[in-house]
Amino acid sequence: MQRRIGLTGGIASGKSSVGRLLEARGWPVLDADQYARDALAPNTAASQAVAHHFGAAVGTAADLDRKALGRIVFSDPDQRRWLEALIHPVVRERFQHELAELRDEPVVVLMIPLLFEAGLDVLCSEIWLVDCTPKQQLERMIQRDGLTKNEAQNRLQAQWPIARKRDRADCVIDNSGGVNDLLAAVSRCGLRADGTTW
C-alpha cells in the first residue's frame, strides 16, 4: 500500500523546508500552494471568476493582483470562504490526477497548508505537522512576505489553531530550532512503525 504523507502546519512554520528535505530523499512532493497558483494563472476559469467577483480591486483575469486578493480575503472571512470554495475543488482534482500518475511510487508527500480545513486529510495515510512558535511564524511572514504585523496575524487566524492540528497529527516536526534539529525531527517522523528508516 502506498504511503501518503500529508505534510501540513501553520503558515510560515517551515513546510517548504521539510518538503525540500523529503524531495532530496527522492520522495515526490505534491504542492497544494503551487496547484492553487496554477488555478489562478492568467485567464483560467478560476481567475476569471475571481476577477468577476472582486472586480477592479484585484485586476483582471489576465493579470490578477495576488497581493491585493490576499489582503481582501485575509481580512474578510466571507470572501476567504468564497475563494476557498472556488479553489479547493480544483486543487483536490489536481491531487487526484497526480496521485493516479504516481500510483507506483511507494511514498508520496502531499504538502497542504489547509490539509484539515480543506478536507484533504482523507487522501493521506499519515499526517506530519510542522510546528514552530507563533512569534517565529509572525517574524517569518513579516520578513518573507513583507506583511504588516496585523496582516500576518489575520493570516494566522484564518487557519485552524495549531493545537487542533497537533491533536490530529501522527508526527509533529518541531521547526523552532536550527537545521540539525529539523533534520533530526524529520528523520524521527520518517521511521516506520516496523523500524525501517526513511
Curated annotation (Swiss-Prot):
Q: What InterPro entries does the record tag this protein with?
A: Depp_CoAkinase, P-loop_NTPase
For this chain, the family text in UniProt reads: Belongs to the CoaE family.
DPCK domain residues are 4-198
Q: What does this protein do?
A: Catalyzes the phosphorylation of the 3'-hydroxyl group of dephosphocoenzyme A to form coenzyme A.
Q: Source species, please?
A: Parasynechococcus marenigrum (strain WH8102)
What's the protein here called?
Answer: Dephospho-CoA kinase
HAMAP family registered for this protein in UniProt: Dephospho_CoA_kinase
- Keyword list, A-Z: ATP-binding, Coenzyme A biosynthesis, Cytoplasm, Kinase, Nucleotide-binding, Transferase
Q: Where in the cell is it found?
A: Cytoplasm
